[in-house]
Amino acid sequence: MVNEFVKKLREDIWQLAEPVIASEGLELVEVECLRMKTRWLVRIYMDREGGVTLDDCSEISNQLGDVLDVHDLPPDPYTLEVSSPGLDRPLVRDKDFVRYQGCEVSIRLEQKVDGIRNFRGRLLEYVEEDGRKILVIEMASKLYRIPRDLIVKANLVYRF
């Protein structure tokens, strides 16, 4: 029940945040909603070509805070954090997997594929097969076909 509430809250905040962020020429990357002891923590990750500035974060925080307050989301006190996605950018939407083909990624699955739950390798392709979206990952010189719907978390891997 709690997970469904958090999922719905995340979706509702995403719907409100996306047009606010887009109006400033930015792209919404991810929304996280975490229930803390006495309040909610809402994290908004956004990006644009050339990166996000501190002024961008401040402006979106002010605008989005007002929008969330008007819609009473979340329904209890909350802290709003707005930032860039960082070097280990989360991969959330289909277009993220398409955009970052050829890049190194880290993927955690809800169940094992070929005996493996955590993958770290190069994202070679993102395709649709028989109505199912599949990531083709090269890891340790072997190819793995990972169903998109099994992914719990996916991020870019940045090498220093």
UniProtKB/Swiss-Prot annotation:
Signal peptide: none annotated. GO terms for biological process: ribosomal small subunit assembly; translation. It is found in: Cytoplasm. It comes from the Bacteria. It holds the Pfam family DUF150_C. Keywords: Cytoplasm, Ribosome biogenesis. This is Ribosome maturation factor RimP. It comes from Syntrophus aciditrophicus (strain SB). The lineage of its organism: Bacteria, Pseudomonadati, Thermodesulfobacteriota, Syntrophia, Syntrophales.
